[in-house]
């Protein structure tokens, strides 16, 4: 199997890479929805997997199928830039939001997850995931908030309501946007 993957069959390589990336994104989404935490073993570990795969499968970033030295270095460099630029951008967005909101606006797990996404998708995929995740989160959460407001009104305890100021995990929306990009 490994020889087939390294041998240059693009369809098998893409399937292999897609399965690994989708698995990481699904696992992270489920854990983040249940616990509001993203474990480092998946975010940082996923970043390391993305960097490694970019070295051995430069096709991940659109380079030649043949495992030649220049393509391998270019794939690794593209992955590294994606990791750094994506996570840095989200860090600064979170820092600016914290300044205005006077409270934590974004978890560190989301920043590390975006590094993983950048390692697999490049910096363009990371930027797409930030804004795509924000749009998906908004589009999917507004109906939930409206239905809850209509159905529950003031009968539901304050700590169980969705609404402004209630923490909503961003990781699943980042993951959905990343999978759309990938």
Feature annotation, model-predicted:
Residues 1-12:
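N-terminal transmembrane signal-anchor/hairpin module of polytopic inner-membrane proteins
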Residues 3, 71, 78, 159-161, ...:
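Compositionally biased, low-complexity repeat tracts
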Residues 7-8, 64, 152-156:
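Short, flexible coil/linker elements and helix-boundary hinge sites characteristic
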Residues 14-141:
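Functional transmembrane core segments of multi-pass inner-membrane proteins
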Residues 108-109, 146-180:
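Interfacial loop-to-transmembrane junctions
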Residues 116-120, 141-148, 178, 182:
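Short basic/hydrophobic patches in alpha-helices and adjacent helix-turn junctions
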